[in-house]
From Swiss-Prot:
Major location (coarse): secreted
Source organism: Conus ventricosus
Record's keyword annotation contains Membrane: no
Full protein name: Conotoxin VnMSGL-0121
Signal peptide: 1-20
Disulfide bonds: 52-65, 56-74, 64-78
Length: 80
């Protein structure tokens, strides 16, 4: 094989490697965005009133997670 043929094959190999690397980064970014959206939704679902916040603060709990059966639900961490 001539030197020109080897150079062309090498160039094609490098181009294919570079494009596959870029595609992988795009997939990772999409997955990362999907995870961030899930986290944001779980945080914004809870409905908190000032009365609930004060109730939890008086009982040495950190966070009001919302109402459960009409009663304030307090916890250190809120899930969902």
């Amino acid at each position: 094989m001539s030197g020109l043929g080897i150079m062309v094959l090498t160039l094609l190999l490098l181009v294919s490697m570079a494009t596959s690397h870029q595609d992988g980064g795009g997939k990772q970014a999409t997955q990362r965005d999907a995870i961030n959206v899930r986290r944001r939704r779980s945080i914004t679902r809870r409905v908190v009133t000032e009365a609930c916040e004060e109730y939890c603060e008086d009982r040495d709990k950190k966070t009001c997670c919302g109402l459960e059966n009409g009663e304030p639900f307090c916890a250190t961490l809120c899930f969902g």
